[in-house]
Amino acid sequence: MILYEYPFNERIRTLLRLEDLFERFAFFLAQEDPREHHVALTTLFEIAEVTGRADLKSDLMKELERQRQTLAPFRGNPGIEQNALEAVLGEIEQTLANLAQMQGKTGQHLVDNEWLASIRSRAVIPGGTCKFDLPSYYAWQQWPAEQRRQDIAKWILPMLPLRDAAAIVLRLARESGQASKVMAMQGSYQQMLSGRSYQLMQVRVPPELRVIPEASANKYMLWVRFTMQDGDVRPRAVDIDVPFHLTLCNL
């Protein structure tokens, strides 16, 4: 099944963006070629843009504290797997401690590093990091892969508590959902939400159908419409019945 996820609010949208960026960063950092490490570095700059929001850290700390207070009373409950509970609570508490230790504005260390700041300013220009534009950056790219990797890992380090916090919040949200098998009649599906507040919607579709879900929702109703794309033309609405799995997640 192919999984599509749709956030119901700006906070979850931001966390999904962060998750995607950190996954891309980790993939390219693990590679060997200087061009792949260039992608890792430019992705690091994107992460700094997203995490630079003034309220992101405080939002994550509030949510983790709320989850800790929700889960802590289940300690000693015979109906709850205690080892799993303690593992989650320990992870939350450690991440809260790491967030509390973060000093200053997120990503400020990148701004304060003049060399990185020069690369960052050139990276937004198409072709702006050629060897004649940034000879010192080109020289750095000729260093051994492991040395480049260590440098980039050092630069991402101050932002890792935010990655860990986002991962916990998204995991708890995803685990809260119950999947149901539904049918989009003639490619369209609607469901009343009765005012219930959800954080995230997951749509899983069989890959062989080659359909693409488009979703929208408010506090009263959600709507999923399926489209199909032929080559490089704009996707078109389908008029066939589409079976899929729908999961609504709420922290």
From Swiss-Prot:
GO terms classed as biological process: division septum assembly; FtsZ-dependent cytokinesis
Domain of life: Bacteria
Keywords of this entry: Cell cycle, Cell division, Cytoplasm, Septation
InterPro entries: ZapD, ZapD_C, ZapD_sf
The keyword Transferase appears for this protein: no
Subcellular location(s) per record: Cytoplasm
Record carries keyword Cell division: yes
Principal location listed in the UniProt entry: cytoplasm
GO CC annotation terms, alphabetical: cell division site; cytoplasm
A family per Pfam: ZapD
Family membership: Belongs to the ZapD family.
Subunit structure: Interacts with FtsZ.
Entry function: Cell division factor that enhances FtsZ-ring assembly. Directly interacts with FtsZ and promotes bundling of FtsZ protofilaments, with a reduction in FtsZ GTPase activity.
Alphabetical list of PANTHER family matching this protein: CELL DIVISION PROTEIN ZAPD (PTHR39455:SF1)
Annotated protein name in UniProt: Cell division protein ZapD
Species for this entry: Burkholderia orbicola (strain MC0-3)
